[in-house]
Amino acid sequence: MSRRGDWVYENNGGTCVAIAGADYCVVAADTRLSVGYNILTRDHSKICELADKCALASSGFQGDIKALHKNLAARELLYQHQHNKRMSCPAMAQLLSNTLYYKRFFPYYAFNVLGGLDSEGKGCVFTYDAVGSYERTGYSAQGTGSALIMPVLDNQLKSPSPLLLPARDAVTPLSETEAVDLVKDVFASATERDIYTGDKLEIVVINKAGTKREYIDLRKD
């Protein structure tokens, strides 16, 4: 019989969302870090800016998440030295997949969503499972509140399926401002039902002009 002592992971909660538009990408996550019914900190960023116009948001076990982010940052720095340019967002998406798959027999307990701009300046979102399987979509949510948020995003966005032929761009029809407002609304709703999501919302908006961050307050109970 399995015992709790055999389980080496801890889920520290939190929720991550990314939305891709025609010329922008929004990556957002709450800042609560918790274990069970205990809040460890109310100001923990789950978003890491890695490559050129690219941000990774992760939920799960923070020990593994920190190790994963550090690994990817080191690989991206090595790429810069070797190629004299920053890694693109699709290239980072493939690197993340390879890194997760490499650890598949003792996986990083991290559930990731990567967002940014591709080589054509279009928004792109890549969503993952724990062992590196991924796909490019118009939007995604990961973490403890994802089951509450994804139905709302499905209803509001209806991004084209990557399985449709002929292929269509997996971007959402909303403007940048509308996408940010939608992210605020879904997080405000999720915090009413998910005790592991809350405190503050960190929003990273990526477009051709660069990257900007915004913070808003969420429920703190």
Curated annotation (Swiss-Prot):
The keyword Cytoplasm applies. Signal peptide: none annotated. The keyword Repressor does not apply. Keywords: Cytoplasm, Nucleus, Proteasome. One of its GO terms (biological process) is proteasome-mediated ubiquitin-dependent protein catabolic process. One of its GO terms (cellular component) is cytosol. Its main location: cytoplasm. It is found in: Cytoplasm; Nucleus. PROSITE patterns: PROTEASOME_BETA_1 (PS00854), PROTEASOME_BETA_2 (PS51476). Disulfide bonds: none annotated. The 26S proteasome consists of a 20S proteasome core and two 19S regulatory subunits. The 20S proteasome core is composed of 28 subunits that are arranged in four stacked rings, resulting in a barrel-shaped structure. The two end rings are each formed by seven alpha subunits, and the two central rings are each formed by seven beta subunits. The catalytic chamber with the active sites is on the inside of the barrel. Non-catalytic component of the proteasome, a multicatalytic proteinase complex which is characterized by its ability to cleave peptides with Arg, Phe, Tyr, Leu, and Glu adjacent to the leaving group at neutral or slightly basic pH. The proteasome has an ATP-dependent proteolytic activity. Belongs to the peptidase T1B family. This is Proteasome subunit beta type-1.
